[in-house]
Structures are given as structure tokens and as C-alpha cells.
Amino acid sequence: MIIHFHISYKTMFGEQIVVNIQKDNEEVKFPLTTLDGERWSYDWCVEPTQQAYTYFYSVVREGVVLKTEWLLVKHRLDMTAKKAAEYTLYDHWKVIPQDSYLYSSAFTDCINHQAPQEMKPCNYAKTVRIIVRAPQLRDGERLGLLGAGQVLGNWNLQNVVPMTQHIYNEWAVDLDATQLQSSHLELKFVAVDKKKSQVLWETGMNRTIDLPEMEAGEVVVYDLDQAFFALYNRKLAGTQVPVFSLRSKKSAGVGDFGDLKTMIDLVASTGQKVLQLLPINDTTITHTWTDSYPYSCISVFAIHPMYVDLHALPELKDAKARAAAEKKREQLNSLSQIDYEQVNDFKINYLHQIFEQEGKKIMSGADFKAFILETQQWLVPYAQYSYLRDKNGTADFTQWPDHNVWDEAERKDLTNPETEAYQNVELFYFVQFILNKQMQEAHEHAKAKGVILKGDIPIGVHRHSCDVWMEPKYFNMNGQAGAPPDDFSVNGQNWGFPTYNWDEMLKDGCQWWTRRFLNMSKYFDAYRIDHVLGFFRIWEIPVDSVHGLLGQFAPSLGMTREEIQGYGLNFQEDRFTRPFITDWVLDRMFHERADEVKEKYLDRLDDERYQMKPEVDTQRKVEALFADVTDEKEIWLRDGLYALISDVLFVRDRKNPELFHPRISAQLDFIYESLYDSDKVVFNRLYNDYFYRRHNQFWYGEAMKKLPKLVQATRMLVCAEDLGMVPDCVPWVMDELKILSLELQSMPKDPTVKFGHLSRNPYRSVCTITSHDMPTLRMWWDENISRTQEYYNTMLYREGPAPHPLPGWLARDIIARHLASSSMLCILSVQDWLAIDERLRQPSADAERINIPANPKHYWRYRMHLSLEELAASKEFMENITELIAQGGRI
């Protein structure tokens, strides 16, 4: 059989089109030929061995791939024409469409519920196949075509020619060419809803096709790109809540996957379509409350054991143990907040008892064996790491007496049930099997209810995590990831994570990231990329720093001395790169304790300046010196010493000591204050060029090396957290890859306005009022009275003084305005939803805060004060939400 490939694509001299075909579990590549650089073709002689072939085109120059088509929806050739001797394909180059979100599993699996079907075989002597994409169709609608002539239905709505959705959102139909009355076809596509007896015609002029002369056994395939219908864009509403914050009568002091199912039911009952969660990965480092930080995972694959639904497990057979467990569960569930340590001790102990009772039976089953086979790449090292962490009493594998790095040679023993090594780790296999099963069940439940589960991809991993232990080549351990100063933290954020070695990751096509995304797609149909700016550049902080002010972007383009001089600033290297400590600085900072600071912590450098003593010349040394201090005055002194150390105008490049970077937010420090006014003007110009213009093309290129691979790794809907210090290149990339942005009215991306205009939100965005890193709406309302007053008058268009605290009716108005925004998704925190009902909401607004980013030691323990059962029974509240969503057009 011969398959003739044809595609029109204008190339540059030296470029070539290549077709990449999936054949017999491998990818084969063939170069196309052209006479004019635009019309390309290739004839493939093949003995068909499969029912369908998928393929895509790419542009290659001298063996280097310059560009590929959109890979999420590849071309598909169904080999269903029984009498076919040859196929002639007329293809379109597939770019990422503006409505690419409609191809995500969020829409195809959760909202529309239309699974692809196999094309029926046809027995025509000559066949014309028509293919078109129709992503706009709603649940229950099918695509058909009508046109001139009997084969095309004679334009009669009673004779619509049905098409088959052979892949998601792509429809195909085979026509008997021998019955066509003319080689000139005129047709249109129609969307048919049989339940409503409605037919919708596509927009635009009639489509025409002029068929070539066809021989017997020939199949001509026309890709007609996309059918467009006059349908409004879908807008959806949802709730964001951490799993750990859920409360039910059955839970054990923390939300679990059983509670997640109940929350899905609640969300669905009000017409909401999205439920957004925080990361659910295992974070167990110390077995203390400091492990409560959900973004500091020890494995990007493993699930945290505390989310196990105990009621979904077999009952404990020992009556005494069962009664004791129930008593402890009730005690933990009565707490207003999560007691992380008690909850995890209880659940791990309970899982151990279930393992002793049911382990052999469950682990001998087919489901468990299939799970091991599917996950062993990460599961086996994770189990060994967890065992060694507990055995050695620390997760810092550099301190272990042996096994300081994962040894692949140990995998064999760790997967052999007869070995001692296996018996050491089998509990961890068992627990992850249970968690995987429960989370997948919750995911399937959400899809059945028409709810999109949206997960969260943390930007980093703990520096002593299993991922670093297993594959250290992917991580830079000589720095710390964080974020520059922003509305969340004036000193920047230091997350402590190692930064990524992207050069190493790109060598294998970002396989670690691809595995991570594929694993996540088992549980979610949408995800939030935490700190998407990190894929452009990450804020890298020296390991001896506590705050983020001494960081620099990586990668970045440092400045030479000559460049700095070129701006008109006399570069005094010693003065600008050493902490600027003088008598007047000390008096301003420490007041009556200035002399104490000079005596204890400083040495005289010259007639004007001081320097830090060697034992306190880094922030980490200061931190260690004050480690056991709890007195507020001493903490104030410690923070002052931190500030002295970061009081520099430039930081030296970490890789090349001959290059320099302006220190972030230097304008707020004493060294900037000491400059002449003319030098301040010059420095400001240099600073703005460096942070907002110098790197745009460079960072665009860095992001485009990584993000296209990652966003096309799965069909999950891609959303990004793009807040903070956002360079101009970020929206370029997000628009090119069709990634949803995050829009907060109180943190507008337009620097010229104080509050964003909701009607100007891009459609491809997620609108919210507050995030887990912010005060809730009620807290924000009372945080800054003058700001609230301005918002009340200018954004809510209300006269007079703003009421305090925030009344429920006004919270409802704010929510209604957000639901009416132009954003595709409006996802609000459960605390902000509850703000509309003064009888139900938490009496203390401060008790609703989930995280304080400025505090790296924050205890993540917020839990809903109401049970899910109580919420479900609050009919007036539930009806209120349903009404708000309907009025916002999000149904």
C-alpha cells in the first residue's frame, strides 16, 4: 500500500519538512520533498500492520528540529477502507489553537463526556474522507455535514450525514465517491443535539472541494481544519481548598480522600465545575509540624499518608484496637486546627495495623502487582529513602553512614518479596498503593460528577528529598530557590529548595518533568504551575543567606564594570558590594543599642565604615547564633543584623566574579540613601533596564526550551501562577502556549492602576479574590482601611464610608462581580464563599489564614470550622451560591 502525504507549509532555505509516524511502537521519520519550498510531499510504501497510524510534521535544518506541530492532537489515519490500495492525504499544519483548552481532559472528560469512537469500516471502491475539528460542541452534541447532492444529504436537515469523533474533538466521515454526482463538492458542518432536536450550522461561507480524478482503491483524505459555530465561550466557577482543610464527621483530624469525594458532591450540587487543591505530595522530613508545608515535598510522585481515608479501609478485627482508634479519631476530629504530629502518628500507626492484618492478601492481588509494575521507577527508591530516613533519624542523606545516593543495583532485592530489603520497605509500597487507589477513585468520582479536579505543581522540592537523593544530577545544591520581594514578603522569599540544573534536564528532553506530569494526570484534569516565572528564571539565593534580598536571577546576564560605568555611575566595587555599615546607619537601625552592636558584632573597617565580625558575617551564622532566642527584643536585634548584611548596592555573580547584578530593592536601603541624587537617578535607570528590559529575549528563549515540552506532556488544562515581578516576556510565552494566567483584582498586572478591572481580564485566565498565600477577603477588608475605602468607592461604586467588618451582603456583591468577569474560570476560596453568610462563616476572620509567605516556618494547619455535612444541610447558603453562579453565566 502507498500513503501519499501532502502538506502546504512555507519554509526558509535549508529547512525541510519531516513526517514522524508512530509505527509498531516506534517512531519512524521520513523527509518530504518540495519544488517550491511550500508544497511538500512524500510517498510511503507500507504493509499495514495496525488499524490506525498517528503522525505529525516537523521542520528540520541539518538534523536539528526547529519546530513541530502541536503534539497533543496528532494527525490520525484510520485504515478502515477495506478496498483501499492507496491513501492520499491533504493535511494542514497544526498550530496550538486559540481554543486549545477545549482539547484538555478538563473539558473532554469532565464537562463534555464524549469519548472517541472507532470509525466503522467502509467497503467503497473509491472513498473521500473528510476530517474536521469541532471543539466547541457541548455535551450531547454530535457533528454532521450537509451539502449538495444525495450523498451529502441535499441540504436537508432530515438527512444530516453523521460523522465519527475518532479522536478528541476531531470528526471524520467516509463518503462513497462512486455515488457523487460531481467532482465539485459544496458542504457545511452542522452540530446536532438530538435530545433537544436542535441543529446549529457552522458560520461562514459554504466549503468547497474539487476532487481529483480517482482510481479504484483510492482513498482521498481532506483535513478541513476547524468548524466554527456561533457559541458563546464557556465560563466555569469553582472552589479552592486544601484537602487537609476539609472537615467531616468521619475524618480523623485532617481532611482525607473520602472528604474530597464529599466536597466534590457539594461543589457539583451548586453548579460549580472546578475544585482546586494544594499539593498532596508526601512532605515527611522530620515527622514534626514543620513538615506541614505542602510545597516542600520529598517526592513529586508519592502521596502524603495523612490523606488516607480510614473508613475506606477494612475494619480492624481487634475490638480493643478498633475502639481505641475510634476514640483517638474523635479526639483529633474535635480540634479546631490540625495537630499535624498527632494526626500523622495516628494514621501511620493505623495503616501499620491494617498492613499487619490485610497486607499479605492485598499485596498478592493483581491490582497491587499492576501498581508496582506501573510505578516502580519512582516507588522503589522512594520506599528505600523513607526506610533509610527513619532508620538514620534524619532525611539529610549526606549524614547517613551509607546509601548517600540511590544505588540502582539495589532495585532487584527491593522488589523481591523473599529478601530482607523488600521486607524493610513493603509497608511504604502498601501505603502508596492504598493512597493511589483512593485518589484515583476520587478523580473518577469528580469526572462522573462533571467536576474538574485541579492540582498544584510546586516549583521546587526539598533539598533532602528523595528526588534529589535519587537523581542529584538534576539539581544545584549550592544555591536556594526563592522569590524576590513582592506584596507577600518585603525581604523576598527563601524556600530553601535546590535550583534545577536545566542544562542536565534538557539533555534527556526533560524526562523527569514529563514523568511528573504524567503521574499527576492520573489524579487531575487541570493543574496550577506554582511560580511559572521559575521556568523563565529562578531567584537564586546564596546558601548562607536567610532572606531573599541577596539573590540573583538564574540564568541572567550579569553586568561588567564597564557596563555599569557606561550608565554614568562611578563603580566603587568595594563600597558597593560590601555591607554599608556606618555610625549613622547603626544609629538609625539600632538606636540605643547601636554601641552594643558595634562592640559585639562589628569590626572597624576604615574611618567611616564597619564590617561584620567573621563569626556573624553571613545571615546563616547570625541565624545559628540566635537559634534558641525567643525574646522579641533579641529577635528584633537579629533581624537588624540580617539587614546590615544585605545592605549592598550590587551582588557579585555567583558563577563569574567579574560580573555584577544590582541588588533587588536596593532603593529601600541605606547604601542607596547615601548616594548623590545624580547617582540615584543613574542607578534607577540601570536598575530598571536590568530588571525589566535587559533579559526579555533571553528569558523568552529559556522558557521556550522547557515549557512547550511540559505543557504538551499531558492533556491536563494548564494554568499558571504568574504573580510577582513579571517580565514582559512572560505574557508572550503564555499567550503562545495558551496557558491560563492568574488574575487578582487586588494585585493588577497593570502597574498604572491600583485595582484591576474585572471586565478586562483575559478570557484565558483564572480569576480569584484571594489565594492561600494571602489574607482572606474578610482579613484583607480590615487590613488597610484607606485602601479598602478606595476600593469601596472606585471599584464597587458605592458612596460613603466602607462598613467594617465586611458584611455578608457586601461579600456577596464582590463575589458576584468576580463571577461576572470575563475570565474562563472563577475559582474562589472556601473561606471567601463562606464570607457571604454571617451565620455560617468563622467568627474570627484571622483564624481563616492558610499561609503567611513572609514566615518560612509557618504552621499549615487551617481547617474548616464547619463539617461538610453541616454545609450540605445549609440549604439557604447552597442555594445562594447556586444563584450567584447562574447569574454570573457560569453554568
Q: What do these predicted regions represent?
A:
Residues 1-8, 123-134:
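A short, Gly/Thr-enriched small/hydrophobic beta-strand-prone motif that recurs across taxa
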Residues 82-98, 215-228:
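Short, surface-exposed secondary-structure junctions/capping segments
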Residues 2, 8-50, 60-81, 136-184, ...:
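Aromatic-rich carbohydrate-binding modules that target alpha-glucans
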Residues 103-129, 176-179, 208-891:
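Catalytic cores of glycan-processing enzymes that make or break glycosidic bonds
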Residues 66-67, 77, 86-94, 100, ...:
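Residue-level recognition of alpha-helical structural elements
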Residues 6, 20, 58, 78, ...:
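Residues in well-ordered beta-strands of folded domains
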